[in-house]
């Protein structure tokens, strides 16, 4: 009788047992570090446990789940997604796989992969709080709040404290806000180095959205008045618009803002129409049309108006990078037309561990050529180009209020004459009592505007929007 194999197995058993103990010890140490709010140390323990070869499937699953949770805490969302995918592969039953899928959906939502997150949790989120929270986050980003209402009604509210309770409350308020009729008021003011003042006041009412088959629709009306004052004369622009938001299936969205306008005895049609096709999280196409008066006193006096047509794309070569090119054609009723384009490259902000801050970056460029350049009526050189690089900072004051800042510098060239340019902006977004919303923007830029541009030019602006559900 050959006794070599049983003897070999007996010799190997202590080594296997020792390795199992090491993996279990690493997992326990990682869980203890998480409970003690030490995610960096926890990640090291869970990574060490996962690196052990030949570990049991349940240990591999536990280590991967812990590694994903640690990475989420530290803001390393791509690493968290990889860890939760590993946990999915090691899951031993449907409940374990759903827990891994919920963690993966949280990591995907944090990277703005909303469609993938929604598809992941929608099959099982009904009646479960954690996956419902991630489904609501994805639905909010996609504008699919009407689809998510049933999930919210079926979920059991979690305790108010902690991440889950806070997110549930905020997302519930966001859903109710999105599905209710809304009133809106907005105010804007700008002043530039030429003494041109532009004051804007507007109000809007939007009906509650409704769905018919694959069509989701929302309609409303808006009224606006704008005063343009250059210190010598003052002009008023008034308009009334029909507002429309249409969602067709999963991929098509149309936004409308169309209606009549007037300035004194001059009557015209104005507004915007925009179509967007977004088949996935990483690519989309868009097209738009805009018609508006040229916003300077002299241009309004001469009844100058333009039509602008644009096509664009959005591409995500990586989780943190967004590339947005646009081409446009702008036709003025004085016979001038422009061919131009713009490009924005965005680096999604990185969360700074153990703080409420995140830092990202932005590159923006614009170029156009006018076939009939002119001076004195509106900014209209033959050739214009500009490019700026900037830093973006985001600070979460608390879960309900967020501050965003941009500081960019670059250069512009107007008919061969170059000059340095800069842009500084601060925005505040948050919630008001009664589930209202506030958006405040302050900015200063030396880049050319519709009225003027060049060395020494600058423009200061402030915009405020307040919305309330009814």
Region annotations inferred by a language model:
Residues 2-17:
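Gram-negative bacterial Sec-dependent N-terminal signal peptides
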